[in-house]
């Protein structure tokens, strides 16, 4: 595998915790899911500790930090509570995301351009504890350029509009937006990741984009795991991504 065809898979285990929290039980254990994902080829584990604690809990994050063999990508809102927790936990990677209590899932990208000083301060605090920061943003040139200005080393492009497109023409347009966003981010010296809404039937065109470093995928893998098991679900996704990346 050459550098040009290398692509990483970050497995988001939030929805293993969603199933647990639905009944207030101790199972299924997202930590076990994370370890299974690593054994199946995941390059990292993503968790989002939301303000309302709807799925991942603080204890999950603490345990994962101790047992992961790869690395944790800690998704977090830009709040004092989350910044203080991240400073304590010191995750290898942190991803700043927008967050609203009423949303089912993260619905859009972070408005970096509209709050540059706030984001710059958060990036500095996280970098000071050794965490590589990415910003979850729409594939919008204005937001990509602002991300570079605030000092974030990485961005994660929101692929939701591509994933939700209902007709082929719209999907093609949205894929092109992602492709152009990757090119711009790379030209500015940023590491470019992507994610949101990706599944087994739409991941390949995104994985084939030259310059994408990592895809973060969760819901589709957790759903598929109900039928084939968690390790198999992760392995199948990784295989699709690697096959697509060889076409770059």
Swiss-Prot record:
Gene transcribed to yield this protein:
pdxJ
Give the PANTHER family listed for this entry.
PYRIDOXINE 5'-PHOSPHATE SYNTHASE
Q: What is its main location?
A: cytoplasm
The family line of this record is:
Belongs to the PNP synthase family.
Recorded E.C. number(s)? 2.6.99.2
Q: List the disulfide bonds.
A: none
Q: Which GO terms describe its cellular component?
A: cytosol
Which is one Pfam family of this protein? Answer: PdxJ
Record-level Gene Ontology MF annotations: pyridoxine 5'-phosphate synthase activity
The GO biological-process annotations, alphabetized, read as: pyridoxine biosynthetic process
Pathway given for this chain reads: Cofactor biosynthesis; pyridoxine 5'-phosphate biosynthesis; pyridoxine 5'-phosphate from D-erythrose 4-phosphate: step 5/5
Where is the site described as Transition state stabilizer found in this chain? 156
UniProt-recorded name of the protein: Pyridoxine 5'-phosphate synthase
Task: Please tell me where 3-amino-2-oxopropyl phosphate binds in this chain.
Answer: 12, 23, 197, 218-219
Which superkingdom heads the taxonomic lineage of this protein's source? Bacteria
Catalytic activity from the UniProt record: 3-amino-2-oxopropyl phosphate + 1-deoxy-D-xylulose 5-phosphate = pyridoxine 5'-phosphate + phosphate + 2 H2O + H(+)
State what this protein does. Answer: Catalyzes the complicated ring closure reaction between the two acyclic compounds 1-deoxy-D-xylulose-5-phosphate (DXP) and 3-amino-2-oxopropyl phosphate (1-amino-acetone-3-phosphate or AAP) to form pyridoxine 5'-phosphate (PNP) and inorganic phosphate.
Cellular localisation: Cytoplasm
Entry keywords, A to Z? Cytoplasm, Pyridoxine biosynthesis, Transferase
Oligomeric state and interaction partners are given as: Homooctamer; tetramer of dimers.
Q: What Gene3D superfamilies would the database entry show? A: Aldolase class I
- What are the catalytic residues? 48, 75, 196
